């Protein structure tokens, strides 16, 4: 860990750290290393799941993000879901979890339903974004959307995650009617209004 942290610290940039914008809590330590650089350094390391879990437990932004690339997605299962969920404190770490790690898990569907039914908004966000980029999206995931929006009526991350999932679902002919039904069922709220506005230009009115 010390060697990896040393590589990160060489790329420290206070201006970048000060300019960062994300939803949620701040990290304990933030060296301001850009995401592309964090990814590049992490990918140069050999995959080691136990080491990744150790990195993830540290209160350092760059180590938490690097853990997503050093961990082995095939070992990300329901039993470990709570461990990873606890570290999802903001939109940045949730997005990295979704794109680099969770979407490749063999148990994505099980983790998706576990996280969207939980109380961590950023875990729900990660689940939505990961499922949107997966090959296992079905009507059962689409059918969770109304409950998610009702649970988070004023959340921009959730709204963005829902749009990503519904947009992905609409690319499948067999799911288009399900997407339309969900959109028609949404009650007025900041989250729902954002979703409806974004989806309005993604779904042609003539269809």
Locations of regions flagged by a protein language model:
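Alpha-helical scaffold domains
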Residues: 1-207
